Amino acid sequence: VFTEVMVSTDDQEIAEIAQRYGTKVPFMRSPEMSSDMAMTAPVLIEVMNKYKELGKVFEQLCCIYPTAPFISAQRLNQAMTLLISEKVDGVLPIVQYSYPPQRCLLMRENRAKMLYPENYNVRSQDLEPIYHDCGQFYCLRTDSLFAEQKLFCQNTLPIVIPESEAQDIDNEEDWKMAEIKFRMLRGEQTR
């Protein structure tokens, strides 16, 4: 589904590992795009500009996050197919919140307060489902990325995935949850 797979990094060790497994690292990421505060859209714009300098132009791109262990080839193929066939700016996987955010609470002066008190007497199952980006991948038209300078473009199509396929890994607890989901997806007993 992809004509080229590359890793964007500023770390030589990561670059060497990526290349050992057959991934291209045609250039290193700039220091400006390597800080903990760097956002993904500017990194992708830098990557596309560097490719253009090398004489390569891509009409579409797909950014895959390394912290998302349950991405499948089928989902990536589905997303790229939708991106092209539906003529949208982007496609991203989303997952329904496990509990309705309309019933969320804020802490004010050491007290719990409903953010949306009008939903106090509404059953959670009667509230409209709300979804969030599950942080796995973004498939985009390159011209839309450049025009809008963001990952979530105006005309973005979602792919709703089950909670069992969504797990971002940012800390040790996330890792443990990923292990549980992995065993569950493989049909193994969880401990």
Predicted features along the sequence, with ranges:
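Short beta-strand scaffold positions
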Residues: 8-9, 139, 169
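Short active-site oxyanion
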Residues: 2-6, 89, 164-165
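Short phosphate-binding loop-to-helix
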Residues: 6, 12-60, 70-78
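Short, high-confidence coil segments that cap the C-terminus of an alpha-helix
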Residues: 2, 56-58, 85-88
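Hydrophobic helical membrane-anchoring modules
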Residues: 159-160, 164-191
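Short, structured coil segments at secondary-structure junctions
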Residues: 1, 21-23, 108
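Conserved core of the sugar-phosphate nucleotidyltransferase
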Residues: 40-42, 69-155, 160
